[in-house]
Design a protein with these regions (language model features):
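Non-catalytic accessory segments flanking enzyme active sites
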Residues: 12, 55-58, 64-66, 81-88, ...
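Cap/lid segment of the alpha/beta-hydrolase catalytic domain
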Residues: 305-429, 436, 470-474
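A flexible loop/linker signature enriched in serine peptidases of the S9 family
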Residues: 12-24, 38-43, 57-87, 102-108, ...
Length: 530
């Protein structure tokens, strides 16, 4: 939805017409449609701010191998579409001229377009297997009038995307704490940064110098927008087990929370010419709701309550926060779900759910593993975010690196025991644990360390670190963070000691292994060999 100024608001959308894909405008007051382009080129596109041009991302199919014998050029060549490339094209809405702007050996990605529509910011990515990180990004500024190119940086590590400031003099850059020679890093001596923990930087185009924006800000940056209306930066981030919006003043670096009405903000959009933010989100016990937020007054207005429709006639149990201090004094955050019609005088079986990897188990109602669904079956459900999780600060996230169960498993075991001690309604002899992917690994690993669980479920779990690292499509990529600098040849004891497969004789708990036979990330062999 865009505005043509003077209060003339309209919606642009595509539809299939007689001559192909049509670009149309829709007047939201009358629903009258006007065809702007009768035969639009196919592909994904974005408007330039002046709405005179469409910038396309066009996929080109790469060279094919024969069907009988395939040469794998590099590990990523096993992934479908690896040899395809995406390039940027420009479509002039007035003249109909459609021209290619980028080409070459690597993909090119649209990052942003300047407010005056003159400059395009785009990037490329190169793979590097001999050092960390395994990808390096280059950023370019293209003058769409003269076609002159300005190389901002080449093959830089730990930087992801960039966007123009409203005046075009600075860039807002997303990356890891190690970006720009580590100016945004905030970890203890001896730690290795967890590059899944997102940071923001300001980059001055005149001086070519960067400065950190979120170095001392604990939440993990997911997305950010530099608003043209008020010049503030709006940040969507993981904040412990919440997903929140914060605003940052680029003039002084001060960050404050936007008082949204939901625990998990799924998506948001800012008006270009008004102090309005729209967002939708959900919480631990409700589905999505859409809101309008007044940036000046700080008030929320409910626009549409989808949750009311989705949860009609559904009874949910209560959800409570429950934290504990680990042996080293760290507060480990968690929460628990009670069955509907809970009776505190009864004894209930309990499920302990965790991921244990680097992403938090957040408070969303709707997720792959719905805690409320398990609670509805008569279980108490306890979930926690142990050391290594993003959203709790860089130091906490860095604990994930070269852990693979170390510290994390101890915290899960300690939390489970303390929870049972403090909650008499749990039947200590009927505790099960479940997790998937890294959580599946954690399920297997836990059974080599404790017998407190009556049953355990590993979904798509990793049983041997070396085979996951070498065979999974993204194994070496994830391991470039999860075990940075550690390989089977320089740390064979670590790869065996932390692998559940090499400790399988210690497992006495009934263990169910669930796996998809087409899994390419954690191949099914991880469960078969276990």
């Amino acid at each position: 939805v865009r505005s043509r100024g003077l209060g003339d608001v309209y919606k642009r959308q595509t539809r299939t017409g007689l001559d192909g894909t049509e670009l149309v405008t829709v007047d939201p007051a009358t629903y009258q449609q006007t065809v702007l382009v009768p035969n639009l080129p196919k592909g994904r596109f974005v408007f330039t701010p002046d709405e005179s041009t469409l910038l396309y991302t066009v996929e080109e199919e790469g060279p094919k191998e024969g069907t009988d014998l395939i040469r794998v050029l590099e590990p990523a060549d096993r992934i479908p579409g690896f040899r395809d490339r995406s390039f940027i094209w420009r479509y002039d809405l007035k003249t109909g001229l459609y021209e290619q702007l980028t080409f070459g050996h690597t993909d090119t990605y649209i990052n942003d377009i300047s407010a005056d529509s003159r400059y395009l910011l785009f990037s490329t990515s190169d793979r590097v297997y001999t050092s960390l990180p395994h990808s390096r990004n280059s950023l370019y500024k293209l003058d769409l009038q003269t076609m002159a190119i300005d190389t901002i940086w080449e093959k830089a590590p730990y930087v992801n995307q960039a966007a123009f400031s409203p005046d075009g003099k600075q860039l807002l850059v997303a990356g890891a704490g190690d970006a720009f020679d580590g100016i945004g890093r905030n970890i203890k001596q001896g730690q290795i940064s967890n590059s899944y923990d997102g940071q923001l930087f300001l980059y001055d185009l005149a001086s070519r110098k960067a400065s950190p924006l979120t170095k001392d800000f604990n939440p993990n940056v997911i997305d950010a927008v530099w608003n043209r209306f008020n010049g503030q930066i709006y940040i969507l981030c993981e904040d412990e087990d919440y997903q929140r919006i914060y605003t940052c003043d680029p003039a002084n670096g001060k960050i404050k929370q936007v008082a949204a009405s939901e625990d998990i903000i799924m998506s948001y959009a800012l008006a270009d010419n008004a102090p309005v933010l729209f967002y939708y989100g959900q919480s631990a016990s409700n589905a999505n709701r859409l809101y309008a937020y007044d940036l000046k007054g700080g008030k929320n207005r409910l626009v549409y309550d989808l949750s009311q429709d989705k949860l009609k006639d559904i009874a949910l149990g209560e959800v409570h926060d429950w934290n504990f201090k680990s042996d080293d004094g760290t507060t480990i955050q968690g929460r628990y779900y009670l069955p509907p019609h809970f009776d505190p005088n009864k004894k209930y079986p309990m499920i302990v759910y965790y991921y244990g990897g680097t992403s938090p188990t957040n408070r969303a109602l709707e997720m792959r593993y719905s805690m409320h669904m398990y609670a509805a079956l008569g279980y108490v459900v306890y979930t926690l975010n142990p050391s290594g999780t993003t959203g709790f600060g860089q130091e906490f996230a860095a604990r994930h690196v070269n852990a693979w169960g170390l510290k994390t498993a101890d915290e899960i075991i300690q939390g489970t025991k303390l929870f049972c001690k403090e909650h008499s309604f749990v039947n200590e002899k009927k505790i099960g644990c479940i997790g998937a992917s890294y959580g599946g690994f954690m399920t297997q690993y836990l059974q080599t360390r404790t017998d407190i669980f009556a049953a355990a479920i590993s979904h798509a779990g990793i049983s041997a670190l070396s085979s996951y690292w070498g065979e999974g499509y993204w194994g070496y990529g994830y391991c470039s963070v999860a075990n940075a600098g550690t390989y089977p040849w320089n740390a064979p004891e670590f790869f065996t000691k932390q692998s559940p497969l090499f400790n399988a004789d210690k497992i006495k708990t009934p263990l169910l292994l669930l796996h998809g036979n087409a899994d390419t990330n954690v191949p099914i062999g991880e469960s078969i060999q276990m």
